[in-house]
Each structure stands twice: as structure tokens, then as C-alpha cells.
A protein has these predicted regions:
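Intrinsic low-complexity, intrinsically disordered or marginally ordered coil/linker segments
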Residues: 3-6, 50-51, 60-74, 79, ...
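C-terminal structured domain segments
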Residues: 62, 68-69, 78, 85, ...
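Long amphipathic alpha-helical segments
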Residues: 161-184, 256, 285-369, 395-408
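Structured, contiguous alpha/beta core segments that scaffold functional sites
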Residues: 2-61, 106-303, 433
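C-terminal anchoring/interaction modules
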Residues: 295, 349, 387-434
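Extended, non-catalytic structural segments that build the interaction scaffolds
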Residues: 39-42, 47-49, 53-67, 274-285, ...
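Generic structural hydrophobic/aromatic packing signal, biased to beta-strands
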Residues: 132, 146, 258-262, 325-327, ...
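A broadly used, surface-exposed interaction patch
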Residues: 89-116
Length: 434
């Protein structure tokens, strides 16, 4: 398995003899592409799991794409923070007995609920599901711990004949793992977790996983997040290309004339065909192939030919459909990208369901600004839209409260409502349960 993060794929290369350059990038749309049929992988004779994507690296590819863009990473963190609201609490009403109130307080003292809840909110916004683990005491009559298992390190076992996934596997799937490095945790049936928990406890089991999942139109083991359209479409690549073009312009004043998008499978096929496994030699081969593409482009320039095909033709005359060449108009000057970057940023914010005025997504540029009242409304709307996600995330906590017999307690996540000056305070907490 090739670690593409260690290879320098994205780069800007000069076109010899021309005041121009070519930008090499990786196809972002490929991250959700299933290149082959997905079948279970075996950790041992008794344990298997369903890979997340054809190469089992999809979550890490998604994280890498998010971390590679300033706007996208900021929007993701903003969405997680809005989902967090004022934090998870177990409210206790006047019907609660004093011992129940004390037990709830002790439960929160023994569990880092702030870190846990912000973590599952991030998993929800990144991947569309979150996994919590509940741990019972030795007697099996109380839940004493609740933990988050990072979604990117979770894999689901194949479903049984009834369509129920029996367990989750937790490990660092970035690299090859051995059986002893994998934690296997029984998964409570998402359709009836309360009944399943009571049955499993009778079998002397004390540790269980509970999955909270955003329903999607296409029911798969791992949901495709709503923002996948950013990568499947063009706007992510457009914004990345603008940054590359600006950098090239600032460094050597050479405009980008060609944009070459290369699928990761192109490099994988080369390494496999030529038996290259060493990282240094892989990078040398990448640089060699880039030179071949540059020679192909300069050869066309020298001969005065027009680029009719959008695909690269290798030295042996084969058309490579994994390498897409886009010719770029070079009449843009350095500062003229301002309008384009604003357009790209707004498209990203729109897809992420974040109003650009809430995250200051175009710093340093004059733009239409909303009034304070409009911003308060936007912030209130953003938090109100978290209601379905809270309902899904609360399932595990309703389970804990019921199992621990904390009658009169219920999970809640108050949100922060920004106030007006006449109320003499900046913000107040509002609960949807009131």
C-alpha cells in the first residue's frame, strides 16, 4: 500500500523555453471512487471487517483533503462547535431523588464529557457517524464509563444473515495491522439497542459499542458525507488551483498555462508494474513521469500543435485517461484572482452549510456585510439545525440513563443564543427541552 502523503505529487514545474508553468495536482473526485468490488478483509481466521473504500484509506484521504484547504477545515470546525452548543448535560427535574442527582454528578466527574462530546460532534460532521463505547461495572448493573472511538479508526464487521452488524474493530488502519493490535468490541443492534443490551449483559459482557449514524439515501456500511459534492464536483480543485497559481506568480512571475490532474491509481499502477517499493525511488519515478508530461507539452508548443485531447499521451504512444490536462487562459494578472477566490470560497461555504459572514471566510477583502441582527439570526438558525444530530447523538445517553435507573434525568444540549444590548448581556443558554 503506497503512502501518497509521503510523496510530492502536487507541484509547479516550469515549461522550458516558455514564460509559463504547469501545475500538477491529484484528482479530488477519486477519493469516493470504488475502483473495485468491496469484499471483507480478514484480520484472523475468526475476525473480518468491511474496508472503508477500495483501499481502506478513504477516511484518511478525506481528512487530508479537508486539512489541505483553509476554508474547508474552518467550516468543519465551525460546524462541530455549533453542534457542541453549550455542551452535553444530563438534566435532572424536580422528580429526581437526591441519590440520582449525586450519581449523575459523579458520572460526569469520572468521564471527560466535554472532550467526548466535541469529539463525536467532529466525527458526525466529518463522516456522518460516531461510535461511543459504554463500559459496565463488574456486577453488570451500572454503566460507569462512556468513551469515544474515533470514527476514522473504526471498521464494521460484515453484517450477519439478519442484516445486523455484530461488532466493530478499532485499530490504526493507516498501516498494516496484526490481529493483536485490533480491539474487537460487540456492537449493540442499532435498531433495538436497549433490548440487545439487556440480552448481552446476561452473557457476562461488560463493554459495548453504540453507533450514532446520520441516515443517508444510499445505505452503506460507511455513509458518504453530504459535502462529498465538493470533491466530486469542480470547486475544490478550482480553489486549490487558484492558490497554486498565486504562489507561482509570486515566486517567479510565471503564469500557470496547464493544469494536470493525476489520479492516484496512475502512480499505483506504475509502481506495481515496475516493482518500485522504495519511497525514494518512487519519488524519483514520479519526477521522471512529470518530466515526460512536461516534454509532451513543450513538444506540442514547439510544433505549434493545438491541444485537442485532454489526456496525456505517454512516450510509447498510449493515451493515459488517468492524467487529465487542462489548458488555462493566462491573461489573469496577480491581483485579478480576488473575484475568483471569493466565488470559490462562497461555493465551499454554501456546500458546508456555513454562512461566510459567520466564519470570516474572505479576510482582508471588502465585501457586503450583514447587520448584527442578521448575524444573530444566522447563528440561531445554524444551532437550531443541529436538533436532528442531537437526537441521534443522545440515543446512547438515553440508554445509559435508563440502564442506570436515573429516573427524572434526560440528556440535553443547550445552545447559546446571542442577545441584544437591551438585555444587558452578550449571550444566554436556551434549551430545546424547555
Amino acid at each position: 500500500m503506497t503512502d501518497f502523503n509521503s510523496l510530492q505529487i502536487t507541484s509547479v514545474n516550469d515549461l522550458p523555453g516558455y514564460h509559463a508553468a504547469a501545475a500538477f495536482t491529484t484528482k479530488s473526485s477519486e477519493v469516493f471512487k470504488e475502483a473495485e468490488e468491496i469484499s471483507p478483509r480478514h484480520v484472523s481466521d475468526k475476525v473480518s471487517y468491511m474496508p472503508w473504500g477500495a483501499d481502506d484509506q478513504m477516511p484518511y484521504d478525506i481528512i487530508n483533503l479537508i486539512e489541505s484547504d483553509e476554508t474547508l477545515s474552518t467550516c468543519q470546525m465551525f460546524n462541530a462547535e455549533v453542534c457542541y452548543g453549550s455542551g452535553l448535560v444530563y438534566q435532572t427535574d424536580e422528580m429526581c431523588k437526591r441519590n440520582v442527582v449525586n450519581e449523575v454528578e459523579e458520572f460526569f466527574l469520572d468521564n471527560d464529557m466535554a472532550s467526548y462530546f466535541l469529539g463525536v460532534c467532529q466525527d458526525f460532521k466529518h463522516f456522518g457517524f460516531a461510535v461511543s463505547v459504554i463500559i459496565l461495572n463488574e456486577q453488570g448493573n451500572k454503566v460507569v464509563r462512556v468513551l469515544r472511538k474515533e470514527a476514522c479508526y473504526v471498521r464494521f464487521a460484515p453484517a450477519n444473515k439478519e442484516g445486523v452488524i455484530p461488532q466493530v474493530l478499532y485499530a490504526n488502519w493507516r498501516n498494516s495491522v496484526r490481529a493483536e493490535q485490533v480491539e474487537v468490541i460487540p456492537l449493540l443492534n442499532p435498531q433495538s439497542p436497549w433490548t440487545d443490551l439487556q440480552a448481552q449483559v446476561k452473557k457476562d459482557k461488560r463493554k459495548f459499542a453504540v453507533v450514532s449514524r446520520v441516515p443517508t439515501p444510499d445505505s452503506t456500511y460507511y455513509p458518504i458525507p453530504y459535502y462529498a459534492s465538493l470533491f466530486k464536483g469542480k470547486w475544490y480543485n478550482i480553489k486549490q488551483l487558484i492558490g497554486v497559481a498565486k504562489e507561482a506568480k509570486l515566486k517567479n512571475s510565471a503564469p500557470i498555462k496547464y493544469h494536470i490532474e493525476i489520479a492516484k491509481s496512475f502512480w499505483s499502477n506504475i509502481f506495481k508494474a515496475e516493482g518500485i517499493t522504495d519511497r525514494v525511488k518512487q519519488q524519483e519515478r514520479v519526477n521522471e513521469e512529470k518530466d515526460n508530461i512536461i516534454n509532451f507539452l513543450t513538444g506540442m508548443e514547439n510544433s505549434g500543435k493545438v491541444l485537442f485531447s485532454e489526456f496525456y499521451v505517454s512516450p510509447n504512444g498510449e493515451e493515459q485517461h488517468d492524467v487529465v490536462i487542462n489548458k488555462i487562459e493566462t491573461d489573469k494578472e496577480g491581483g485579478d484572482w480576488a473575484t475568483d477566490i471569493i466565488e470559490a470560497v462562497n461555493m465551499m461555504c454554501f456546500t458546508m452549510r456555513v454562512h461566510s459572514n459567520l466564519v470570516g471566510s474572505v479576510p482582508g477583502k471588502s465585501q457586503t456585510n450583514n447587520s448584527g441582527s442578521d448575524k444573530r439570526e444566522l447563528y440561531t438558525i445554524a444551532q437550531a439545525l443541529q436538533k436532528p444530530y442531537h437526537d441521534l447523538l443522545f440515543n446512547v445517553h438515553r440508554l445509559i440513563i435508563r440502564f442506570n435507573r436515573w429516573n427524572g434525568a434526560y440528556p440535553d444540549c443547550p445552545f447559546i443564543q446571542l442577545t441584544t444590548l437591551d438585555e444587558n448581556k452578550d449571550a444566554k443558554q436556551v434549551s430545546t427541552e424547555e
